[in-house]
A protein has these predicted regions:
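Ordered hydrophobic segments in well-structured contexts
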Residues: 33-37, 55-57, 288-290, 297-299
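Short aromatic-enriched loop/helix-cap "lid" or pocket-rim segments at secondary-structure transitions
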Residues: 48-49, 90-92, 194-197
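Long, charge-rich, low-complexity alpha-helical segments
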Residues: 297-358
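Conserved NTP/Mg2+-binding pocket subregion across the NTase superfamily
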Residues: 2-6, 16, 67, 74-166
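Helical scaffold of the NTase/Pol beta-like nucleotidyltransferase catalytic core
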Residues: 1-33, 358
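Catalytic metal-binding acidic patch
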Residues: 35-81
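Conserved nucleotidyltransferase catalytic core and NTase-mimicking acidic/glycine-rich helix/loop elements
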Residues: 138-286, 291-296, 302-304, 308-312, ...
Length: 358
């Protein structure tokens, strides 16, 4: 493994690695359409234990061997696809396979969809943006259905028909594992995780956003409370599980699969206990969507506030109304009653719901 370079050093990849790969592709006569950082077949399936894994997609249909090279002491491997082969893998669905092949297909598709383009971004986005959204929503819906959770804001609904406590704890852990997986995928974190450690939650949670939740999530997955405090009763523990699950899904849904829209401070404020226990309101704020609780707020571009994701995440009309009312009280306490006058609250809510399509 490389000693002096950080695989998360995007500048090094953009400046040195990308240049070398493009030069080699040109030498082979390949017209490169786009290049992804960390890709579907790179982990565990690459032919060598490389330090940096890329996927190169070219406009031709002929096969080409992988690109393997050393760049400033760093081992780089790029899996090369023709456009037709790449599209075929992206087109794989949840049907027609069973057992290990089923999971391989989904994993290959997902990692290709959620890898970060470092070259040809516009071409990649134009072709696969909707597929990424569809894949994310399908995953979210499937897990919501399998766990019989009415919404992510209604934890109690999962426990009304009481099962054995051990079974409920297992279901909660699976739910949190999936939420973490969604967030890792959305941040392109397949690239940063430990190589060849295929167990989903044994990967290393790296990056600014994930570093803040790594210890807490690890504790919850081990059946403990974050920071070693509080009761480990099912109700207390599951409440934290669903709080962190909702956070991971929320960040994944609205980051547009990029971490750049959220700062470490945003996540840190969101993770404060009073914030986790308060409903989050979502409403328009100028050209952005403002996400507001009593203790934290951050803005998201409206293009990323997908109506279906809002619904699946449990942001019903009631929750949006609660958020607006909480925001109005918050501003009123600061002497800014004019921000959301009470008599405009219902009209504002209706406008928001129409614009968000909920």
């Amino acid at each position: 493994m490389m000693k002096d370079k950080n695989i998360g050093d995007v500048n090094f990849i953009d400046r040195n690695v990308l240049t070398a790969v493009l030069r080699e592709a040109e030498r082979r006569g390949l017209e490169v359409r786009f290049i992804l950082m960390g890709g579907s077949l790179s982990e565990g399936l690459a032919s060598s234990a490389s330090d940096i894994d890329l996927v190169v997609v070219h406009d031709g249909e002929r096969k080409s061997n992988n690109i393997v090279m050393i760049v400033e002491g760093v081992k780089v491997e790029a899996t090369v696809f023709g456009q037709q082969d790449f599209s075929r893998i992206i087109g794989m669905g949840r049907q027609g396979a069973a057992g290990a092949a089923y999971f391989w297909q989904l994993d290959a598709r997902r990692r290709l969809l959620f890898s970060r383009p470092i070259h040809g971004h516009d071409a990649y986005e134009a072709q696969f943006r909707q597929a990424r959204l569809d894949d994310f929503v399908a995953d979210l819906a499937e897990f919501q259905k399998s766990l019989a959770i009415k919404s992510f804001s209604d934890v109690k609904g999962a426990f009304d028909d009481a099962l054995h406590e051990d079974d409920l704890r297992i279901r909660c852990r699976i739910h949190l594992e999936h939420s973490v997986d969604l967030l890792l995928s959305s941040l392109g974190d397949y690239y940063f995780r430990e190589k060849y450690r295929m167990a989903r939650i044994r990967r290393s949670l790296k990056g600014d956003c994930l570093a803040l939740v790594e210890d807490s999530i690890s504790a919850l997955l081990s059946g403990r409370m974050p920071a070693g405090g509080g009761s480990t009763s099912l109700s207390a523990w599951s409440g934290q599980v669903f709080a962190y699950s909702s956070l991971c899904q929320y960040l994944a849904a609205f980051s547009d699969f990029w971490s750049g829209w959220l700062t470490v401070g945003d996540v840190e404020r969101f993770l404060q206990k009073p914030v986790l226990e308060s409903p989050v309101g979502i409403f328009l704020f100028d050209k952005d969507v403002l996400c507001q609780s009593r203790r934290a707020a951050f803005k998201i571009p409206t293009a990323f506030a997908n109506a279906m994701a809002l619904t699946l995440l449990g942001f019903s009309e009631v929750r949006v109304a609660e958020g607006i009312e909480a925001y109005a009280r918050y501003e009123s306490a600061r002497g800014r009653d004019e921000v959301v006058p009470g008599n405009l609250l219902q009209r504002k809510l209706e406008e928001i719901m129409v614009k968000l399509g909920v």
